[in-house]
């Protein structure tokens, strides 16, 4: 399990997260929701290990405990951590004209022996990851020529390649996928396809997934659990049906909604009241 316990994060005098506790369970998708500036990306970066130790930005102070499979996150070296968790940030725009294939192969480098090169197996995994991300038609393209949605799917393939299961990976224990607004640049169909894939690999590969999603209806349909972030802490965490209530949404967003049952067994759809 990937767990934050009594987490506090401050940037100089600005408290961003306060006394926050949350666990990401293997095999399940947790959607993180909250208004702009609530601290969602900060929480994800903290879970990723990007705000502690030598990589901590100036002025950032983090207290509390974060453990990955029972081990303090700060004690895991960078290479092993890259084999245990993958991160898809909001803006992953390459500055150089790499090919789609090269970008996805970057996900395999934590698994390459020091001083070695990617293998035929790595290239096969990259191709399979592109297929699962519905990005295989983009192979050979210069990534600087891709649309925002095309690039998002390629970057999603990269993190799939990073966590692709093999014997060594499975022996290392549960692994984790951290996604910061993975659907933001995608059209309607690709939003649902990507989150369908996320849920499928969470179960197949025993991944714990934390995904920041802005659309509550999208989150409710695809996540196993939802965590609502407000005032620097988790104000509700549970199943979509339990969390996505008018009272919780009003508390989190200051916006009135009502719930409409769809009749297909899925959680109710949220509409303005």
Curated annotation (Swiss-Prot):
Residues 2-256 form the ABC transporter domain. It comes from the Bacteria. One of its GO terms (cellular component) is plasma membrane. The keyword Disulfide bond does not apply. CDD domains: ABC_Iron-Siderophores_B12_Hemin (cd03214). InterPro entries: AAA+_ATPase, ABC_transporter-like_ATP-bd, ABC_transporter-like_CS, P-loop_NTPase. Keywords: ATP-binding, Cell inner membrane, Cell membrane, Membrane, Nucleotide-binding, Translocase, Transport. It is an enzyme of class 7 (translocase). It is found in: Cell inner membrane. It is a peripheral membrane protein. Part of the ABC transporter complex HmuTUV involved in hemin import. Responsible for energy coupling to the transport system. This is Hemin import ATP-binding protein HmuV.
């Amino acid at each position: 399990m990937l767990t934050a316990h009594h987490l506090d994060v401050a940037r100089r005098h600005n408290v961003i997260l306060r006394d926050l506790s949350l666990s990401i369970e293997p095999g399940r998708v947790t959607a993180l929701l909250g208004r702009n500036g609530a601290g969602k990306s900060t929480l994800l970066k903290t879970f990723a290990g990007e705000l502690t130790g030598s990589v901590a930005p100036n002025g950032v102070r983090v207290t509390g405990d974060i453990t990955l499979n029972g081990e303090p996150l700060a004690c895991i070296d960078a290479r092993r951590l890259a084999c245990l968790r993958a991160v898809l940030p909001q803006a992953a725009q390459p500055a150089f004209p790499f090919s789609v294939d090269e970008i996805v192969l970057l996900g395999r480098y934590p698994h390459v022996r020091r001083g070695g090169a990617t293998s035929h197996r790595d290239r096969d995994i990259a191709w399979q990851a592109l297929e699962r991300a519905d990005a295989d038609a983009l192979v050979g393209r210069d990534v600087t020529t891709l649309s925002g949605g095309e690039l998002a799917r390629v970057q999603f393939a990269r993190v799939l390649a990073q966590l692709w299961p093999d014997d060594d990976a499975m022996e290392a224990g549960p692994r984790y996928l951290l996604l910061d607004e993975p659907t933001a640049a995608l059209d309607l169909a690709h939003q649902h396809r990507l989150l369908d894939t996320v849920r499928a690999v969470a179960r197949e590969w025993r991944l714990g997934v934390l995904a920041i999603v802005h659309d509550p209806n999208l989150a409710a349909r695809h996540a196993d659990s939802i965590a609502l972030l407000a005032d620097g802490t988790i104000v509700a965490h549970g199943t979509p049906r339990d969390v996505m209530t008018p009272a919780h949404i009003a508390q989190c967003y200051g916006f009135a909604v009502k719930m409409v049952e769809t009749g297909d067994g899925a959680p109710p759809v949220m509409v303005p009241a």
